[in-house]
Structure formats: C-alpha cells, structure tokens
Amino acid sequence: MPRVVLNGVTVDFPFQPYPCQQEYMTKVLECLQKKVNGILESPTGTGKTLCLLCSTLAWQQHLRDAISSLKIAERVQGELFASRTLSSWGSAAAASGDSIECYTDIPKIIYASRTHSQPTQVIRELRNTAYRPKVCVLGSREQLCIHPEVKKQESNHMQISLCRKKVASRSCHFYNNVEAKFLEQDLATPILDIEDLVKNGSKQKMCPYYLSRNMKQQADIIFMPYNYLLDAKSRKAHSIDLKGTVVIFDEAHNVEKICEESASFDLTPRDVASGLEIINQVLEEQARVTQQGELQQEFIVDTSSSGLNMELEDIAKLKMILLRLEEAIDAVQLPGDDRGVTKPGSYIFELFAEAQITFQTKGCILESLDQIIQHLAGRTGVFTNTAGLQKLMDIIQIVFSVDPPEGSPGSLVGLGISHSYKVHIHPETSHRRAAKRSDAWSTTASRKQGKVLSYWCFSPSQSMRELVCQGVRTLILTSGTLAPLSSFALEKQIPFPVCLENPHIIDKNQLWVGIVPRGPDGVQLSSAYDKRFSEECLSSLGKALSNIARVVPHGLLVFFPSYPVMEKSLEFWQVQGLARKVEALKPLFVEPRNKGSFSEVIDAYYQQVASPASNGATFLAVCRGKASEGLDFSDMNGRGVIVTGLPYPPRMDPRVVLKMQFLDEMRGRSGVGGQCLSGQEWYQQQASRAVNQAIGRVIRHRHDYGAIFLCDHRFAYADARAQLPSWVRPYLKVYDNFGHAIRDVAQFLRVAQKTMPLPVPQAVTSSVSEGEIALKDATLSSYSLSTRKAISLDVHVPSLRQKSIGLPAAGDPESSLCGEYEQQTFSAQQRPMGLLAALEYNEQKAGASEEQALGSSTPSLRFEKRLSTEQKGGRKKVRLVNHPEEPMAGTQAGRAKMFMVAVKQALSQANFDTFTQALQHYKSSDDFEALVASLTCLFAEDPKKHTLLKGFYQFVRPHHKQQFEDICFQLTGQRCGYQPGKSELESKLTLSEGVDRQLDPGQHLNHGQPHLSAHPTSKGHTSHCTKVGCAVEKPGQPAVSDYLSDVHKALGSASCNQLTAALRAYKQDDDLDKVVAVVAALTTAKPEHLPLLQRFGMFVRRHHKPQFLQTCADLMGLPTTGKDLELEGPRDESPTVPPELTHEDLKPGPSMSKKPEKTQSKISSFFRQRPDESVRSDDTTPKPMQLPPRLPHELMKPHRSKQ
C-alpha cells in the first residue's frame, strides 16, 4: 500500500490519497499531536472514514514505536531519562510532542457513531487497510445476548434486568464461560464486528455481551454508539473510562440533538400510574407473604422468601413518594388554552423535593427501585411491565446527575444548571392514543387528561463539557454537513482550535445543481405552511417529478420535508393519476415510518434499480429520515436527488419555541458583539443541515456523478443558498423556466454517461442493525414480495387504504374472533406433522396466476435444512451460490420455502409457531375459516405484513382460492391473481403425482376430512356432511357473538380488542392466569360489568373451571369458594366452546399437569382486598389479614387514577 508522511507520521493508505484526503489526515494528526479538539467537515464521498482510521491508527502505532525505542535505549545505556522529552530520540519520536512520563498506556481511540449499525460499515473499511489493531465493539444486550430466556423479553430494560439477575446468581452459563474461555479462545481474526461476536459466542458457548466488555480492556480502538459516551448512565453501566482517550464523533451533525436528548425527559401520567400499579402489586404480594409467615408462627418476618429483600415499610414509602410526585405535578396550575406553563430549570428540584426526592434520598430510592425491577425480571403477564419504574429511575439519575460539593446545599446545583434547562408542564395530548395499548394498567390512567412533566436541556455544552472533564485527550467532530463551522463550535462551548472545511474530490462535469422555483405549468413550487397542501402546488410538483423521472436514468431520490407532506402528496397524486404516470417510468418505493421494515423496502429498491429490464426506480423519503442519514446511494442507485422543500422544525412546538428563546437569551448575555447563534439563525440551520444531508446521497465516490434538483422557490434566496455546502455552491444555477432545467440536465447526463467510467457491479444491501444475521438481507432482498409491498402506495398513505366490506376488518378483532369460533369445521385427529411437511404440501399450479401474485424472482440461495433442527428452532444454514444449476424460485417448493423464511423473519417466534400450527391444521382439516381467522390476526393488522398475507395464496387449496382472494382484497386492497377459468384445472391437478408424494395416501381424496380418512375417526367427531370443507352447524354458537357484542357495547372497542387478543392467547398457551388477568382488569372496574366476568366462563376449559370459579368468587367479593357461583353455560363440554378448547389431546399447558389448587389466583393480588376477605394458611383456618402496625393502611389501597 502507498505510504505518505504527514506531520512526521508515516501513514499507510490503501491507495494514493487525493489532496483533500491528505489535508484531512494532516488536520487529524495536528489534533492528536497537539492534544487539542477539532471540527473537520469533508463532503460525503471523500473517504473521511478511511482517512480517520488510517491517520489515528498510524499516530497510535507511531507513538507506540517511539516509546518502545525510548525504553530500549534506556536499557542499553543503563540510564533513566524520565525528565527528557521524546524529541531527544529523533524526529520520529518528536512528532508526538509528549514526554515519556505522560504515558502509562498508549491512548485508546474511541470511535462513536450515531447507530449500532454504522460500526459494521466502519469495520468493513478498517479491514481494507494495512492496520490490524485490537478492536472492540460495544453493543446492547438486544444485539449481543444469546441467552434464550433473556432474548424473549419484550423490552430492553427487561432484558437488562433479567440478565443482571442471572449474572448475579451465576445462573447464565454463557456468562460463566466468559472468564474461563476468554483467554483460551482462538480468534482467527482480531477485527470482530457485532455479527462476528455473536457467531463466536454461540460457537464457544460464551456471552458476546460480556466478551466484548472484556475485550475493551486490551483494545486499541473501541466502537460504540453516541449515547454510550454522552449519557452518564450509559458510561457508568459500560464502565467507560475516558481519561487520556481520543474520542471521535462521526456524522457529528447529530451530536447537538443527542446531547440535549440524553439530558432531557418527558414524564407522562401513564409512566407514574404504571409504576404505582407495579409497586402496589409487590406491596400486596409481600404483605401476603408476611401474613402467611405469621400464620405459620415464624418468629421473624422474612420477606426474602419471595425473592425480594425489602421491608414492607420501605415498599410503602416508595409508593408514597410516587403518590406525592403525582400530586405535585397535578397541583401545577395551567392556563386554559392548553399551552402549558414553563418554569426555570431549578424548579425541577423544588417539585421533586415535595415528593421527598432529593440529593440525600436519591441513593435509597434508586436502590429500592432497582431491587423491585430485578425481583420482577423474567415474569410474564400484563401486570409485570416495569417500564414505568425503569423510566423513573432514569429520570432521577438525569435530574441528580451532578452531585453538589460536600457541605453545599443541592439548590446551588439547581441554580448552576437553570440556564441550560427548562421545565415545561403541559396537558397530555396523546391520552386517546394511549387507550389503544393493551396494557391493563395504562387504560385506567388514560381515562383522564393528565399533565406531562418535561425537563428539557437546550445546551449541548452540558454533555460536551462533561466529556472534557472526564479527561479526554482529544475530541474530534467530523461530518459532511457541519457548516457554518463557527456557529457549530460555539454551540458546544468548548475550544476547537483546529477546523477544516474540505472541498470535494469531483470535477465540474460530475455534478449538476439546479434551483427550480416553478413547475412545468408555471406554478410556483413551495413547501411553505400556507402553500404546501394547495392543489396547484401539489399538482405542479407531481408534474415536475414525472418530467424529471423521464430524463434521470436509474435511481431517483425524492426527499420531502416531513411524513405528513409526503403522504398528502402521494394521496393527491394517486387520485389525480400522477403517481401512475411516475410508476410507469420508475416504480415508486416509499420510506416507511416503521424502521423495522426499512431494510426490506430499500433492498427492493436496489433490486429494481439493478434489474437489467427496468428503467430504474424512484425512492420517496423524508429529510432527517433513515434514507437521508448515512445510507449509500452510489452510482446507479442515486443518479438524481429532488428536494421538495425546506424541512423547518414545527414552529409552534413548545420545545422549538423554548430553544429559540434560550438562544436569544444567551446571545443577549454575551452582548451586542457576541457570536452566539440567535434563535432565528438556529431555526434556519436546522432546515439547511437536513437538506445538506439529503443532497449528500448523490455523490459517494471519486467517479460518481449525479444531478440535484432544489424544487422550492425559497432556495433561490441568498440566505438559503449561503447555507448550502461549499462544494455545491460553485455548481448552483437558478432556472426560471422548468424546460430549460430539463434541457440542461439531460445534456449533462448524456455527457456524463459517455465520459465517466462504468461503475463496478457490486451487491448493495441496506445497513441493518448488528445481530441480524445475513439470512435476513438475503431472503428479503431476493423475495419478490418485498417489491410488491414497497411499491404499494396504499400501505404508506392511510387515506388510500381499501376499506373492508362484509368481512372482519384488520382492526376489528372481535369480529374475526366470532368467525374463528363460529365458522369452524370438526377436525380429524391427525398425527403430528413437521414444518417441512406443511411446507411441501402445495397444489400443483397450472398457468401463471400465482406467478403474477408472487412476482418473478431468481434468487441465488440454497437452503440446507434438517427437519429435526428446524422443529427445535435450530439455525438455518444459507449458502450463497453464484451460478445455481437449478433455480429453486422457479419451482413451487422453492417459492414455498422462500415464503416461509420471509414469514419467520417478519414474525416473532411465538407468532411463527401460531402460523405453522394454523398451516398444519388447515392441511389436516381443510378448515378455511379457522385458517383465515389465524392469518388475519397475524398479518392483516400490520400493513407491512399485508404482502405476506397475499403471498399465502400459494398454500390455499383450489376450491378456496377465489374466497381467499376476496378476503385478501378486502383486508389489504391487493389481489392474488385468481383466474376463475383455471380453478377446475387446479382442482384436478391436486391429485397429481407431486401431491401423491407429499400427502398421506389415506387422505388423498378428502384433504384430511375425517369422514373419508383411512384412519379411524375420533370419537365424537361423526360427520353427516357429504361435501368437502362444509361447516357443521353447532348449537349454542350465537352465545359467542352475543357475548362479544355485549363486551363491545359495555367496554368499548379498545377493551374488546384486548379481550379477544387474550382469548386467542389462551387457546394457544392454556394459561388461565394470563387471560383472567386481562378479563378481570376490564370487567371489575364497575359493578355493572361483573356479569361479563361471570359469562366469560363459557370459554374456560373444563380443567380450569374450579380455579376460575374460585377466582370469580374472590373478585366478586363472595365469601365462598365458588360453590354457589354458577357460570353461564354447562359445566362440562359446553356447545358454545369451540372444539379447539375442549379437545383433551391438545398440548397441555402449564396448568394441565396438576390439579387446581385452592389458592387464590395471581390476578387477585392486583385488586384491593375487601375487609371480609381472608387468606387461608395450610390448616385452612380463616384469619383476618393483619399488617404490621408501622405500615399505614391507606397505602395498601390500590392506586386509582382520578377520573
């Protein structure tokens, strides 16, 4: 590799660096050698990541060699030169500018990125260099943990709590192996990213999370996300020592926002209410344990028997603190116009002091909250969500992050930070949306409009100064969009002696930039608030896009100011037919709001652009979205970028208003000649930096080229043009006539295509978060359903979605549940069948109807599976094949396998198990209604899974295909390609040789119906039907519909949705406690709803009825154990209960293996104990519940939010 000497340091570079790259590395070395901070801007595509790595690692190696040389010389001469500088040992040593006594270790390099996924790209660049340092990548448990039980936890904080619990008890064998195997392991390559850590940890049976933390001690360079550095809590949790380190923030244009957000919070009424409910649950649980201990004549009350080492008095005090905090927030008077009230930052200490949360008590409170969270870690159910408690812990740590000096009151700290913070209390506006959540504790809090406590930091200098105070040697901020550098440095309020604003490496024939103030029809283009939704402006913008799509080859990017503007534009273009015109030229792909589905959409876009038969594609995205931040649209993926407006922040948002006021106040304090940003300047910079990030997608390397269209008349203003990057401004031209702009850009692109070298073909994939195996990228990019999904505008524009007529809608779970319970056929008892058997049971296809539904795809993937491994949840092996001999996508089995892989990636493990069970049940029973009910629950409620519902068409039997297409169209608005003339032919082909090989010979004629099966029909399942697939009418079925209708009328749609979801889960897991917890929470709030709880007995399985009767007696306040309580419907096999709930041969749940106990159900601990209730000891002698005298009785009452 070429070597260049910069500032006395020899740098190995993969190729001869360009002048701007040499200048960039020189500035980096200047920061390192002088131990000063630097702000370095270099346009996207100039190789700044490579320059950063090579220059910093060269300096680190240079310093290591210099110190080694000094030590060798000392030993040879037998003299100590501790007081002499390294310069005495030659120019090589002098380049560092440090003395030997300054070092005990070589300074570590900390490379911080915005997301968890970006370090993978940086490590990929590192592997292309000559340097092989010791590397460590720090990630979260969500990316690194391989423990099955911890991975099942739904939230990140629950994963953390359960992990800590297992580590403390030494019950995680993966963690136990880290210390034993860390030194023994043979790491083939020293440069490991997240995926390598996970693979290596799984192979060696040791925890990747703690393995990476061990590797941190010996690492030369450490990669981590921003928040691990900027958030004091994260720094402490990951034991990050910053003393003497070199800290690099890549993509640093986001640092200001992340600094402020890491020191801010919003506390909602739901957060406090959920925390109170959890504490109340623990309080009653511990009181019950204490009572049982007294009844057993234990002379010491020991609550540790339940796993929680806390006194009842301490738990009660914690509950009182939260109650007082809630009262203090509610007591704040607000103006009547819902604007909220703003107070200085020091007010937060006054407010918390009313709840007895101070610098003196914070330690005990945090310790108590942590103990409760650890105690509940690993529990499942609706009443064990500890997110509220975890948020309260985080809030206390944020407020009291800086301890006051010894002997000084905490109020001095409040006065010191009041200038950087504001307290804003405002009415909660999202309480209606909160009612849709399935958490039973949140629905109570959401019945009233509470107050949100916001504590906002407006100065990123707080976090930056804290970094400097930690002893950071050098701080380097770099990005492609930092201009103007002076104001960017002023915001941080720390010195940055070294600054650089680099030019681009491209020539003038590689970039075309045009400001287009008017559309083809002469209408002014504007995204201003008063014009952005006008029909004239939207129509002109759509016509401009259509014309630009004609001349720009390959990939075209369109950036909107916000999601609402993009959705409104798409809606209008769809209605006016403009979207259809663009799609005819370049298919439209839309950036989803949900980040989880982004990778498959962008992969589908890449695939469409790379297709030789296509004219390219159009990708619609938003400024500040994922597509505009660090994603690669090099070469054909992005030949043109259209920016449709200036993305200003919402001007009336309270946080934006207060930020601008804060900056104006700071500028006023600094005097007339102060250089601080004004609020208006900051407001304009927020828009310009978002635009600069978006246009940076077009030029990604030295030989790339492209065109930039700025389609807003305000870009023609001098102040807006001055905010554009310095490398763009020389190419800028304003076009008063749209036709002239099209003429010039067409000429530019024709010349560029002829003169620029052809791009090297390469597989481009989106950057997904670490821990996601390569299988996801491969399957989703090759699976053509993702293309269909991505270009479906209806998915992304709510107003364009088709409405369901005559069938249960996706958002109407009670209707679908009625269909699930009332329209089922009797199923024959079948022997268990594996997943591959269900996969390969596909009718042979005649014609291209399914090809049309699935789309054409030619993936180069071959899957190697073992049935036993698949059934046990083992990993799939994927082998990439460059030239497969037999493309599997062309076969029915190949498409089926690819579809199943895509489904498994899209669903959780529990939902995927439900899907496979539904598939097997359909195969054995031909029960189409039950199948549709299951698929609707899994796929119809989430728009991003609509394509998977459509893709299931290939598994549907011929006589059900037309019905399935109708249902699919009404649920998703998508057709499956059904052709009536071919249904009879398909039916005949189901008895072909291919099916004979896949089905049991005894089931060929009837697809598994019991009346023709070769196997004996199960007892009680006699059928009088002579048609395949017809339903048998069952008495009592209307009771199910009547019950769900009554629930809907009494409790509302949201509560009915919760009940139906819980009932479906009960069918699957046989967990009575879980379903009763939901039903009881919904039906016991008001006395008139108690009959709904009693009537729920029609769904309870026979082996659960004694326990359910006892629970009902407890909840309804009856003194008996349920003997006098009659449930609606017969006690035994009720005709209203579906067969799936009464079959004794179902897989037993956790409660089927033992007889029902006479103890109270878990759910009862959530509700208030009535005075006449009693707790039974082992001798069954009733005794009133007694609490310790020191415990206030009013604290034992469950918390109920005010109506």
UniProtKB/Swiss-Prot annotation:
GO terms for molecular function: 4 iron, 4 sulfur cluster binding; ATP binding; ATP hydrolysis activity; DNA binding; DNA helicase activity; DNA polymerase binding; metal ion binding. Its main location: nucleus. Pfam families: ARCH_RTEL1 (PF23109), DEAD_2 (PF06733), Helicase_C_2 (PF13307), HHD_RTEL1 (PF23116). Residues 7-296 form the Helicase ATP-binding domain. A motif (DEAH box) lies at residues 250-253. Residues 998-1020, 1120-1203 are annotated as: Disordered. The keyword Ribosomal protein does not apply. [4Fe-4S] cluster binds at residues 145, 163, 172, 207. It comes from the Eukaryota. Residues 1123-1134, 1169-1181 have a biased composition (Basic and acidic residues). A motif (PIP-box) lies at residues 1160-1167. One of its GO terms (cellular component) is nucleus. InterPro entries: ATP-dep_Helicase_C (IPR006555), DinG/Rad3-like (IPR045028), Helic_SF1/SF2_ATP-bd_DinG/Rad3 (IPR014013), Helicase-like_DEXD_c2 (IPR006554), HHD_RTEL1 (IPR049909), P-loop_NTPase (IPR027417), RAD3-like_helicase_DEAD (IPR010614), Rad3/Chl1-like (IPR013020). Its EC number is 5.6.2.-. A probable ATP-dependent DNA helicase implicated in telomere-length regulation, DNA repair and the maintenance of genomic stability. Acts as an anti-recombinase to counteract toxic recombination and limit crossover during meiosis. Regulates meiotic recombination and crossover homeostasis by physically dissociating strand invasion events and thereby promotes noncrossover repair by meiotic synthesis dependent strand annealing (SDSA) as well as disassembly of D loop recombination intermediates. Belongs to the helicase family. RAD3/XPD subfamily. The PIP-box (PCNA interacting peptide) motif mediates the interaction with PCNA and localization to replication foci. HAMAP family: RTEL1 (MF_03065). PANTHER family: DNA REPAIR DEAD HELICASE RAD3/XP-D SUBFAMILY MEMBER (PTHR11472), REGULATOR OF TELOMERE ELONGATION HELICASE 1 (PTHR11472:SF34). NCBIfam families: rad3. This is Regulator of telomere elongation helicase 1. It comes from Mus spretus (Western Mediterranean mouse). The gene is Rtel1.
